[in-house]
C-alpha cells in the first residue's frame, strides 16, 4: 500500500467538506408556509368575487414573478413572506452533515386537538395552529425559533374552549324550582328532571354544581354585608358627641317625671 494514501492531504480530502455538502438555499428563499383548504375560497378573498371576512384588511399576496399564488398543494394553500393564518405546516430548513454541528430536524409537533393536513406528516415539519388574525401582520415564521414554534403549539393544545350550554327559560325555571326544594338532588331526581326538560343528566349535574357555588358566594357576601353593617352601627354609636348624650339623658329624665 503506497504511503501517499496516508498523507495529510489525502486524509483531509476524504472527509466531506461542509460548504459542499450543505444543500444550496437561495438568500431570499424562506420556509414555505402551507394553509389549510378554505372550502373553495382563497385566504384573501373568494374566487367568485365576493370578499371573505379578511379580504378587506389584508391584500392579496403577489409572487416575485408577478402572479399571485393560489394553487392548492396537497389539499392546502401556500402563502408568501412567511405570514400565515390558521393551521399551517412550516417545513424545516435543510440540514448539513454532522460535521457542521447542525441542529437535527425538528420532529412533527402534533397533538390530538390539531388535525394534520394530508401529505405533510413528515418528520421535517412543525405544526403551528391556530394564530389569531390580529397577529397576522406581526408574525413571521422565518424569524421564529424552534422553541417558539413548540410553545405556540403547546399553548394551543393546552387551551381548549369548552362548549357552553344555553338553557331556555323553561329549563331554567324547572332547574331553579328543584334547587329551591333541595340543593343536592340524587341521581334519580336529576334523571327525571333531565327527561322532563330534554337535557342530559350530566348537564343537570353541572348546573347544580354551578348553582350551589353561586348560592354559597351569595350567602357569604350577605353575611359579610350584615357584619359590616353591625360594625358600622357600633362605631357610629360610640362616636356620638357628649352633648347628644346629655340631651338624650335629659329627655329620659323628663319622660320619667
Curated annotation (Swiss-Prot):
It is found in: Nucleus. The keyword DNA-binding applies. GO terms for cellular component: nucleus. One of its GO terms (biological process) is neural crest cell fate specification. PROSITE patterns: HOMEOBOX_1 (PS00027), HOMEOBOX_2 (PS50071). Disulfide bonds: none annotated. Keywords: Developmental protein, DNA-binding, Homeobox, Nucleus. InterPro entries: Goosecoid-like_HB (IPR051440), HD (IPR001356), Homeobox_CS (IPR017970), Homeodomain-like_sf (IPR009057). Residues 213-257 are annotated as: Disordered. Residues 241-257 have a biased composition (Basic and acidic residues). Residues 160-219 bind DNA. Its main location: nucleus. CDD domains: homeodomain (cd00086). GO terms for molecular function: DNA-binding transcription factor activity, RNA polymerase II-specific; RNA polymerase II cis-regulatory region sequence-specific DNA binding. Belongs to the paired homeobox family. Bicoid subfamily. Regulates chordin (CHRD). May play a role in spatial programing within discrete embryonic fields or lineage compartments during organogenesis. In concert with NKX3-2, plays a role in defining the structural components of the middle ear; required for the development of the entire tympanic ring. Probably involved in the regulatory networks that define neural crest cell fate specification and determine mesoderm cell lineages in mammals. This is Homeobox protein goosecoid. It comes from Saguinus labiatus (Red-chested mustached tamarin). The gene is GSC.
